Amino acid sequence: MPRIYLSPSTQEYNPYVTGNGSEEYFMNLVADAMEPYLLANGIQFSRNTPDMTAASSIRQANRGDYDFYLALHSNASGSGSQGQNRGVIAFYYPTSANGRRGAEIIARNMQEIYPLPERVVTRSTTLGEVRQPRAPAVLVEIGYHDNEADARWIESHIDAIGQNLAMSMAEYFGLPFTYPGPSQPGVIVTESGGPVNLRAEPSVTGRVLTRIPSGETVTVFGQYRGWYVVLYGDTLGYVSAPYVQI
């Protein structure tokens, strides 16, 4: 299954114009909101912590084996134009084809929920968080926190933003999007007593990640057309629903 590295902003010194929190605070809320949607769609993830920096986040990601690096930020206008700009920008590294593809998917989906869709754009950049990760990377600036309307939109749409970004990650990896249910334990049960396949896609032709013995307990995160998204040990994948007893 795909694995992504989430890097919500560590910039606690960037206050929202509303006075309700910082860039670090709200981008971590967005990352929190993404988690159940990612799990329900078979996407594993790791993330930084607020005491880290962009540089240490990149180093940590590069020590792992990730398929995508997603940095979550909100923007601010330059001196003399504070509060005057609005919009969402998905940045990618100029020579990264998959970074550009990810940015285009994110921007297209974000246009569906941002109140000014014509101001949702993609741009290339050489910023460290798209240049230095080994995995394809996107840095998304979700609105301007020095603009009253943007700041209030972010604050009141945390779950919608998290869902939208998770939907983009599912699309990037070619996975069907599934809405999460409450996570719950399940038991693998087969009539023969043999193991079942944990697959990378919800299909009998999906790549087999591992085999789960009958009687083993798994955690169920979601369901898609007769398949459950389950976590077995450290491996997230799909199991045919008839073999999972909840």
Name every feature range the model reports, one short phrase each.
Residues 181, 232-246:
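Boundary regions of SH3-family modules and the immediately adjacent low-complexity/disordered segments
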